[in-house]
From Swiss-Prot:
It is an enzyme of class 3 (hydrolase). GO terms for biological process: nucleotide metabolic process. It is found in: Cytoplasm. NCBIfam families: maf, PRK14367.1. The lineage of its organism: Bacteria, Pseudomonadati, Pseudomonadota, Betaproteobacteria, Neisseriales. Its cofactor is a divalent metal cation. This is dTTP/UTP pyrophosphatase. Its EC number is 3.6.1.9. Nucleoside triphosphate pyrophosphatase that hydrolyzes dTTP and UTP. May have a dual role in cell division arrest and in preventing the incorporation of modified nucleotides into cellular nucleic acids. GO terms for molecular function: dTTP diphosphatase activity; UTP diphosphatase activity. Signal peptide: none annotated. InterPro entries: ITPase-like_fam, Maf-like.
Length: 201
């Protein structure tokens, strides 16, 4: 089997891995995602991915009495605008605030990936730069009313309606979605796990 454990509830991360041909088993990895005072954004996403991995791994071991037979992947994504971390908005008002902040400017999207396999772990942070067109208040209001921004870092989905706001991307589309494919597969290979199933099809 080409099985992976995914410590995430993100349908986007699940979609990315299943498209590569992996059988994905979801594990809960609920943690406190509060940003520490003056915490560096790259360190923040790395810490989140690592804490999710530890949480999911501990729960798996407690439930099954053994370590996972397959790699456990966790990830975290944040949007950074002018040095300020924009996570998932907690309200429509906050989503509007985030989108006004991103309007007409460049921002950074950081995604950290942590993989644990057979007692070894790999961690990487992948960086992307995105430029938004200037947004009108009507566009922002209509987008927020669609509901799409409410469970997305930075209050937009690169693969959804939010794509109409994007002028340019420098980096990885899948990384902005929440799981950079190139880095993730490279980490799996470095840990000695099999290449994506489609390669041997």
């Amino acid at each position: 089997m080409n099985t992976l454990y995914l410590g995430s509830n993100s349908p986007r991360r699940m979609e990315i891995l299943t498209q590569l041909g992996y059988q994905v088993v979801k594990l809960p990895a609920n943690i406190d995602e509060t940003v520490r005072q003056n915490e560096d954004p790259a360190r923040y996403v790395q810490r989140m991915a690592e804490e999710k991995n530890r949480t999911a791994l501990t729960l798996f071991c407690e439930t099954n009495g053994t370590m996972p037979d397959f790699p456990l992947i966790t990830a975290d994504t944040c949007v950074v605008s002018a040095g300020i971390i924009l996570g998932k908005p907690h309200s429509q008002a906050e989503a509007i605030e985030f989108l006004n902040r991103l309007s007409g400017k460049q921002h950074t999207v950081l995604t950290a990936v942590c993989i644990h396999y057979r007692g070894n772990a790999e961690n990487r942070v992948q960086t992307n730069r995105v430029v938004f067109k200037p947004l009108s208040s009507e566009e922002i209001s209509a987008y927020v009313q669609s509901g799409e921004p409410m469970d997305k870092a930075g209050a937009y989905a690169v693969q959804g309606i939010g794509s109409i706001f994007i002028q340019s991307i420098e980096g990885s589309f899948s990384g902005i979605m929440g799981l950079p494919v190139y880095e993730t597969v490279s980490m799996l290979q470095d840990l000695g796990y099999r290449t994506p199933p489609f390669i041997r099809a």
